[in-house]
Amino acid sequence: MLLRQLEYLVALAREKHFARAAQACYVSQPSLSAAIRKLEQELDVPIVRRGRRFEGLTPEGERVLLWAQRILSEQDALRHELSVLRGGLNGTLRLGAIPTAMPVVSLLTTPFCERHTNARVTLESLSSRDITQKLAEFDLDVAVTYLDDDTLGQVRKTPLYEERYLLLTPTHSKLADQPLATWAEVAELPLCLLSPEMRNRRIMNGYFTDDGVTATPAIESDTVSGLYSHLHGSHWSTVISHAWLHMFGVPDGMRVVPLKGPAHGPRVGLVIAARSPEPVLARALLDVARQAGVHKALDDLLDVHLMDSGYRDIASKSLTVGP
């Protein structure tokens, strides 16, 4: 059994088409088909369900695919380990992040690249479900996501920060000068919020429900930038995570208002697949994360914006204030 055969199988499972898989592997289709048939013979199991076209993998093939992905991932890890011994970390770190955590990723990737000048980073914006799948299939080295997500499976977790929520509203809004706003009061404003399929929105919906109301925003977006693009016309309000202030800040004509609610929000952090040894690049990012002080950096920035909005007595405390 050759590693090349496993690479062909992984490509076929990804492309779901013999010709496209062959093209992705830079070989002819007959060569790819022959290599996979030889793999079936060597393992003495049917791997591919064949008809007039590719019809998927057999149950045995699915198991072989999992092992192939694992073996190829371990091969990459070995190469990275050896590259470090030869003269420093290099290669490409494959990093995924939920959309609501994207604004803070630079707090990790910038010091990572400054420390490891021969390494590169590819960054994908992914749903928590996609992150789980890509980690399991060894298509990601590490990801930034909610740590309490039940779908994560077997992963190692490194907390980065707790989400804290606040209202962004026009300075002429009826809530702009309040010391605290309730979720019920927020629900009465002209709102733009994240889309319901976003985990962040589902968390917020829970807070609205706990306050006895349902939010019905006029505008919904699946990106943070989509929300912020509506906040310059002095009409719309939204609820944001304090982590977004790092990239977007407080738009002109807007004001931050603390929200009454739980003192502790959901945790966001780094996750990697629970395997040993850890991928070298992922381990290097974890080392950076432990020294980056993301939690403190975000809280310090939050204090600045709260003080600018006149909340000096709330700065340095949790954004959401309990009853």
Where do the model's predicted regions map?
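N-terminal winged-helix
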Residues: Q29-P30, A34, H80, R86-H116, ...
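Short beta-strand-centered segments that line the small-molecule binding cleft or hinge
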Residues: R70, L85, L107-C113, T122, ...
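Secondary-structure junction motif
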Residues: V104, Y146, A176, A181-T182, ...
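Hydrophobic hinge/microswitch elements
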Residues: S127-L140, Y146, E197-V257, H305-M307, ...
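Flexible hinge/capping segments at coil-to-helix
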Residues: Q154-L191, A282
